[in-house]
Amino acid sequence: MEVYLAQPRGFCAGVVRAIEIVERALEKFGPPVYVRHEIVHNKYVVESLKNKGAIFVEELSEVPPKAVTVFSAHGVARSVEEEAAARDLPVLNATCPLVTKVHNQGKRYITKGRTLILIGHAGHPEVEGTMGQVPAPVLLVQSVEEVNALTLPADTPVAYITQTTLSVDDTRDIISALQARFTDIQGPDIRDICYATQNRQSAVRDLSKLVDVILVVGAANSSNSNRLREIGTEAGVASYLIADGSELNPEWLKDARTVGVTAGASAPEVLVDDVIEAMRRIGPVKVQVLPGREENIEFRLPAELAAS
């Protein structure tokens, strides 16, 4: 069986930074370190950090006084930041810098007097954080139909921002609908999109031209991993999302001569290796890494940890 590995795949710079923040905090301050929400959406990563002394909570009320606290890569609402400050909790902010950039874009648009529209998935932690960071009501849209259902007058000055785990391709139709709907509209430069989201989706599109089956390594609650699976399916290739090798169903590969493997931005390479090993237990496997866009982006750590 020929196995093609998509490039790039797996961890993005924001995820690497977030995990390193927790690990360095544990080294510097000692366990426990409290993390609000899953640091990234991957059970393996979360369990690994738990084993090192991290404690994951959903609300700050679960954090003891004076305990070192980390905000997840998805970002948090201002109310969460204010609660942490009121309790005098020592906070390390692992919010992805590209998410913070979206927060700042939204604030600038509000300052200009524009009604803000967020393109994203309801209930996603990043969306909740972004809506809670902007000091004004935000309209959330997830589809062209929801754009058409907006009751704002056509001449309302509006601006849009997008969830970072959505690519240019994911948002293109919604943005076009917004531009057709409103006469005075602004949005971020296309260069401001999350590089990792776009690169991984483009790699899956390339992969889909070569293989009979696509396996996406990632968590069920990972937005970007689910989207990679959808892209494979949309390209007409049988595509499956799996957390690790234990979830591999041999039936998926029964008639496949070529299999493509990729991983969401929060999935570590060790899980890709685990899936390949599971395939080897089914039959002989020859692995080839496809050429793709090289990523050399690194994000700086918080000052409190940079020198540790």
UniProtKB/Swiss-Prot annotation:
Q: In which pathway does it act?
A: Isoprenoid biosynthesis; dimethylallyl diphosphate biosynthesis; dimethylallyl diphosphate from (2E)-4-hydroxy-3-methylbutenyl diphosphate: step 1/1; Isoprenoid biosynthesis; isopentenyl diphosphate biosynthesis via DXP pathway; isopentenyl diphosphate from 1-deoxy-D-xylulose 5-phosphate: step 6/6
Q: Does the keyword Iron apply?
A: yes
Gene Ontology cellular-component terms for this entry are: cytosol
As recorded in UniProt, its EC number(s) are 1.17.7.4
In the UniProt entry, which residues are flagged as the active site? E126 (proton donor)
The enzyme's first-digit EC class, named in words, is oxidoreductase
Keywords from UniProt, A to Z, are: 4Fe-4S, Iron, Iron-sulfur, Isoprene biosynthesis, Metal-binding, Oxidoreductase
Cofactor: record remark:
Binds 1 [4Fe-4S] cluster per subunit.
Q: Which NCBIfam families match?
A: ispH_lytB, PRK01045.1-2, PRK01045.1-4
Family, per entry: Belongs to the IspH family.
**Protein name from the UniProt record:** 4-hydroxy-3-methylbut-2-enyl diphosphate reductase 2
- Native source organism of the sequence: Bradyrhizobium diazoefficiens (strain JCM 10833 / BCRC 13528 / IAM 13628 / NBRC 14792 / USDA 110)
